[in-house]
């Protein structure tokens, strides 16, 4: 049995696509994040996983990959992703927990995780899992919300917020919503055996007045010009990091899925489920989605 359960932010049943993205005035943020991800992402590869893929907003950027795994904690988000994505044959849809990922060691060439880190209670534990499933020298592109952006600094100096943006410790400003100091995040990556290669600061112009008065593509174009400054300083609300997994090669992966509870690789298909031969748990596989969130049956 692996470690105790950790609180997870669950978007099950939410209208995330419509209530947060589409028609909600975040076209600029979407464009800016796409620019950052495209600049950091290797152009092609065999197997990529996106952790916290939601409804598949960024999946079109993975066209150069033979197989793409879209993982989310909310099954309803992946059901929406199936409808949202036209060439779904390239995609593998998996419900899972970032703290207990249902994949064998060293499986993925590339890993992406955008707008997920800010929901994580235990960043070191999550990074340990990401390190486990990526191959030696594989690439991880990780986004995190930053506490040390210009707006928070100004608020703190004007005494309009209590927390210090220069304090390295994470701040939970709403339940299960965290901002991180870029230096603290770099330290966590290093301790998890990731070597930071590139950093891009993103969403320089996330200011209501600018967003209201200027076209999103103008703001995104200016953001693209400013993003490389993240190599030297990070004063934006969003930071993208490209890091390499620094670990010794253990040879080719021993399969694909593993039981997220006992980590056995011996999973046998039976009807619309996979049965773990070690612990006896049954994992749902119907509807084109592998569901490793809650077992159908437990020993």
List PLM regions with ranges:
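Class I SAM-dependent methyltransferase SAM/SAH-binding core
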Residues: 49, 54-100
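A C-terminal cap/extension of S-adenosyl-L-methionine-dependent methyltransferases
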Residues: 159-162, 187, 198-271
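Conserved class I S-adenosyl-L-methionine
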Residues: 1-44, 57-58, 77, 139-164, 293-299
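Acceptor-substrate binding/catalytic loop of class I
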Residues: 163-184
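A conserved beta-strand element that flanks and buttresses the S-adenosyl-L-methionine
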Residues: 112
């Amino acid at each position: 049995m692996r470690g105790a359960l950790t609180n997870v932010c669950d978007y099950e049943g939410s209208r995330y696509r419509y209530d947060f993205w589409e028609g909600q005035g975040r076209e600029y943020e979407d464009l800016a994040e796409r620019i950052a991800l495209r600049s950091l992402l290797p152009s092609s590869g065999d197997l990529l996983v996106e952790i916290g893929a939601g409804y598949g907003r960024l999946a079109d950027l993975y066209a150069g990959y033979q197989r793409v795994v879209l993982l989310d904690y909310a099954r309803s988000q992946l059901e929406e992703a199936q409808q949202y994505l036209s060439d779904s044959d390239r995609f593998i849809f998996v419900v899972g927990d970032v703290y207990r990922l249902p994949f064998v060691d060293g499986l993925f060439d590339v890993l992406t995780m955008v707008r997920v880190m800010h929901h994580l209670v235990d960043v070191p534990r999550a990074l340990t899992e990401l390190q486990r499933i990526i191959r030696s020298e594989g690439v991880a592109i990780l986004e995190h919300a930053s506490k040390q952006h210009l707006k928070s600094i100004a608020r703190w100096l004007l005494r309009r917020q209590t927390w210090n943006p220069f304090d390295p410790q994470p701040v939970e400003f709403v339940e299960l919503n965290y901002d991180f100091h870029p230096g603290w995040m770099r330290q966590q990556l290093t301790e998890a055996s990731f070597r930071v290669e590139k950093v891009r600061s993103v969403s320089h112009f996330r200011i209501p007045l600018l967003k209201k008065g200027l076209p999103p593509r103008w703001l995104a174009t200016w953001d693209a010009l400013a993003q490389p400054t993240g190599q030297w300083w990070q004063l934006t609300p969003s930071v993208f990091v490209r890091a390499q997994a620094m670990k010794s090669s253990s040879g080719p992966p021993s399969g694909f899925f593993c039981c997220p509870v006992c980590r056995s690789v011996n999973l046998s298909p039976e009807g619309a489920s996979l049965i773990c031969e070690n612990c006896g748990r049954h994992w749902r596989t119907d509807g084109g989605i592998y569901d490793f969130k809650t077992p159908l049956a437990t020993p």
